[in-house]
Design a protein with these regions (language model features):
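Short extracytoplasmic
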Residues: 53, 58-93
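Transmembrane signal-anchor/signal-peptide helices with a preference for the extracytoplasmic
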Residues: 38-60
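Short, low-structural-confidence N-terminal segments
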Residues: 23-26, 36-46, 216
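Soluble extracytoplasmic domains of inner/organellar membrane proteins
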Residues: 86-217
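N-terminal positive-inside, membrane-proximal cytosolic segments immediately preceding the first
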Residues: 1-34, 55
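Membrane-proximal soluble domains of inner-membrane proteins
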Residues: 1-4, 66, 191
Length: 217
């Protein structure tokens, strides 16, 4: 008798499952298809992104090779193309390299491209500071100290990645302008910063020694 009841129970369960399947099978299948499509789509996206990155890397290397061969105009054009079409990581590197290629034959043109990067709010703070410093390095011998100060002061703040170089450039610019007060300010800041690289600290100390003594009040 128990076996008969078991068979009846099993039949009831099968009938209930059949009803549930008949009622909800279309939803179950749809969910399964959506999961498969989502997984497939994500893997497809990952594949395409990896493919784009690999292509951009190869194109970047090819442009760098042109630069090594002193084909700067061709290299600049190649980096410009990458800056417009490559994934975001390579895009910024390409913009910086395009500016460097322009600077190799026209420093003012290179500085202008670096200034565009520095003014681009979509660019990270470190990249902006790097662009400011590279532009300033190109213009150090021709630009005024007030202009250099306006250009570089944001990069000199405590904790800024490139603050040491920015401070040294400002010290040199002030020195060139015979502004000993400003030169001393930046040299003192370089020497007093415990994280200043030793070679730069030595240069700053050498320049400090050449400054006239501070007048006693």
């Amino acid at each position: 008798v128990s076996e008969l009841f078991d068979e009846v129970d099993e039949e009831v369960r099968r009938e209930q499952l059949k009803k549930l399947w008949d009622q909800y099978s279309i939803y179950i299948i749809a969910v399964a298809l959506l999961i498969i499509a989502a997984v497939g789509g994500w893997r497809g996206y990952q594949y395409l992104e990896a493919k784009k990155a690999a292509e951009a890397g190869a194109a970047f290397d090819a442009a760098a090779e042109l630069s090594d061969q002193n084909k700067h105009a061709e290299a600049e054009a190649a980096f410009d193309k990458l800056a417009a079409t490559a994934p975001s990581g390579y895009r910024m590197l390409a913009r910086l390299r395009a500016a460097a290629e322009a600077a190799s034959h026209d420093p003012k043109a290179g500085a202008k491209l670096y200034d565009e990067i520095a003014a681009d709010r979509s660019v990270g703070a470190e990249e902006q500071d790097l662009a400011r410093i590279r532009a300033a390095g190109l213009l150090l011998d021709v630009d005024t100290y007030p202009n250099m100060l306006q250009r570089l002061e944001p990069a000199t703040k405590a904790g800024a990645t490139f603050r040491h170089t920015a401070r040294e450039l400002l010290a040199l610019s002030a020195w060139r302008a015979n502004d000993t007060t400003a030169a001393r300010q930046w040299l003192d800041m370089i020497v007093s910063d415990g994280e200043t690289p030793q070679a730069m600290r030595s240069r700053a100390e050498a320049l400090q020694a050449l400054l006239p003594p501070v007048a006693k009040s």
